[in-house]
């Protein structure tokens, strides 16, 4: 069995390791605004950005992507208050890699998973980062995990 860089195997589940890249930049940016509010003695800015910083960090910490090979499903938890979404492998359609550039500089790369639900195609985000290569490596590892179990 291959060792995975982005996943940790626990029983029949493959749990994606936390990826702080893009989310941590957002949290640090909001923390900078909160600190700027301290220097300018603006309590509204301190409270607003302080609370947003904490909420965003908790949201990043709660994000999960699990591949359960016993139940043959993806389990995706995004956001602070959303319930985990369970997607059977049989409903999986494909992955989408979205790359956002500003003036030839890549600012965000996100990996989305498309699946069928009630005869409609739905989309759910899996991961975000700064490089296409890291997202492609993640796709390759997911394919290695689900490929032996007859994805098609």
Question: Which residue stretches match the model-derived regions?
Answer:
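Conserved beta-hairpin
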Residues: 55-88
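Generic beta-strand structural signal
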Residues: 9, 67-69, 97
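N-terminal membrane-targeting/pre-transmembrane regions
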Residues: 1-38, 120
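Membrane-embedded alpha-helical segments of small multi-pass membrane proteins
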Residues: 35, 51, 55-58
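Non-transmembrane, membrane-adjacent beta-strand/coil modules in membrane-associated proteins
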Residues: 76-137
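Short, structured motif recognition centered on aromatic/hydrophobic residues
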Residues: 12-17, 65-67, 108-115
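Cytosol-/stroma-facing membrane-proximal "stalk/adaptor" domains immediately downstream
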Residues: 144-152
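Hydrophobic alpha-helical transmembrane segments
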Residues: 38-52
């Amino acid at each position: 069995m291959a060792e995975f860089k982005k996943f940790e195997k626990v029983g029949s589940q493959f749990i994606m390791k936390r990826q702080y890249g893009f989310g941590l930049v957002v949290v640090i940016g909001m923390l900078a605004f909160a600190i700027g509010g301290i220097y300018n003695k603006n309590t509204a800015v301190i409270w607003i950005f302080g609370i947003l910083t904490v909420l965003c960090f908790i949201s990043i910490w709660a994000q999960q992507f699990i591949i359960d090979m016993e139940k043959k499903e993806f389990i995706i938890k995004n956001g602070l208050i959303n319930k985990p979404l369970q997607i059977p492998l049989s409903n999986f359609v494909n992955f989408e890699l979205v790359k956002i550039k500003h003036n030839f500089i890549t600012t965000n790369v996100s990996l989305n998973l498309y699946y069928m639900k009630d005869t409609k195609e739905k989309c759910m985000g899996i991961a975000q980062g700064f490089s296409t290569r890291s997202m492609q490596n993640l796709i390759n590892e997911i394919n290695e995990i689900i490929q032996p179990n007859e994805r098609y």
